[in-house]
Amino acid sequence: MNKRFATLLVGLLGGLLPHPGYSQQGPAFSQDPEVRAFIVAMHEQHGFDIAHLTRQFASIRPNTVVLRAIRPAAVPEQQRSWQRYRERFLTSTRVDGGRAFWQRHAVDLQRAAATYGVPPEVIVAIIGVETVYGQNMGSFGVLEALASLAFQYPPRADFFRSELEQFLLLARENGVSPLSIKGSYAGAIGIPQFMPSSQRRFAVDFDGDDRIDLRNSNSDAIGSVARFLQQHGWQQGAPIAVPATVTGDPAALIAAGIKPALSVQEMAAYGVHAVADAERAAALIDLVTPGVATEYWLGFDNFYVITRYNRS
């Protein structure tokens, strides 16, 4: 199809197709010139039908809740609190739920550990943090959420446009309408909260039913979490983190970030000491709680791999 004609077709369809009210959210996405260009690109690069895709974008609008949620209030340094953060996640609901989840899915967890080298406790902890073992997978329409962030949130527009592209491909591959899929305000999907690109690249059919279903299959979720970590460099049997004592000024080490760069032995020259392999690379992590002494840990490669899953 001629590109100029394709662009014109998108424009005509965007203006003529009906769409639901929601006037507080602005015009339908199909009326946005950037969205029209995106639709043309999806047609040219992946063979999507322009009219069909335009109808889908005509039924969604910028979601102001999503746009507010992606802009969390900045937390001043003096308000950081490891204790508050810890209490938020280490609740009796998560602990009891984790124990029950582990018992119910022990076979799959052991199989994932044998296949990918990731221990059950790490997989269980991640799923507990992400969705409380599938109880809170998000209620946002993923197409609307990703479109809102792709075209209404300039700081990360490139990232979310890429995820929107991956999401449409994912929906087509699975034979489902992109309008039917629910997830987080950032477009993460299912029990393990995979972004669309991660689902296409790392998710696995771990229950052997010839389909990957991260919303309904705990087995697929378990295997996919383990494979994600393995593919990002998980080292079987290696430590994640150990407590550290600090006698010097740790500012430079903290500022260096969480990717392991110095050996434990090299850390000692900065007044950082821990019981660990002297040659193992580490990063210094500070856990700050106002009014109490800062807690320090050395994070190793496996800790960094976990942050690749979710930095928060």
Enumerate the language-model features and the residues they cover:
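Functionally critical loop-and-helix segments that line ligand-binding/catalytic clefts
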Residues: 193
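Cell-wall glycan-active module
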Residues: 1-4, 8-161, 166-182, 187, ...
